[in-house]
UniProtKB/Swiss-Prot annotation:
Name by which UniProt lists this protein: Ergochrome gene cluster protein CPUR_05425
Function: Part of the ergochrome gene cluster responsible for the typical purple-black color of the ergot sclerotia. The ergochrome gene cluster produces several ergot pigments including the yellow ergochrome secalonic acid and its derivatives, as well as the red anthraquinones endocrocin and clavorubin. The pathway begins with the synthesis of atrochrysone thioester by the polyketide synthase (PKS) CPUR_05437. The atrochrysone carboxyl ACP thioesterase CPUR_05436 then breaks the thioester bond and releases the atrochrysone carboxylic acid from CPUR_05437.
Domain of life per record: Eukaryota
SUPFAM superfamilies listed in its UniProt record: NTF2-like
Pathway(s) it belongs to: Pigment biosynthesis
Length: 153
């Protein structure tokens, strides 16, 4: 049974605030110990990742982007299902090129409602197709593995 709506709403507000402030500790601090992250669309074939694999990636991204701004367009919260969706446009400066990502983040709250259990992120694929290779080259690493490659197929 999902947590009370007020508890979820407080967590959602903290999540959006940390995202707007682009604060790694506050943002990641809201993730549960069993947190999982999935990049959408599913057709991209990227694997679901646990907290310990995603947190360093977020810290790196947060450390790379400067003058970060988040324009939240819509928030939908379904407390009866323990879920919320945030649609926003993020913009920032980076050494590898300007960042402007239109995205929707789908979150599932923990049973207690005070943590984020999972996050699924749908990005602007046209932008990310151009920007991601520059970002990965700037940091000296290749693209994350696809689900197929991660499974050893």
């Amino acid at each position: 049974m999902p947590a009370p709506a007020e508890v979820q709403q407080a967590t959602l507000s903290k999540f959006v605030d940390a995202w707007k402030r682009w604060n790694a500790d506050d943002f990641i601090g809201l993730w549960s110990d069993s947190f999982t992250f999935k990049v959408l669309p599913l057709s991209d074939g990227k694997p679901t990742r646990p907290r310990d694999k995603v947190a360093p990636l977020y810290r790196n991204l947060i450390g790379t982007l400067t003058d970060y701004k988040l324009d939240v367009k819509h928030i939908v919260h379904d407390a009866s299902k323990g879920k919320a969706c945030i649609y926003a446009v993020a913009s920032a400066n980076a050494p590898c090129g300007d960042y402007k990502n239109e995205q929707a983040i789908f979150i599932t709250f923990s049973e207690s409602g005070d943590k984020i259990e999972s996050m699924e992120e749908m990005n602007d694929n046209a932008f990310r197709k151009e920007w991601d290779p520059k970002y990965h080259a700037y940091h000296g690493y290749g693209q994350p593995p696809t689900a197929k490659a991660a499974a050893g197929s």
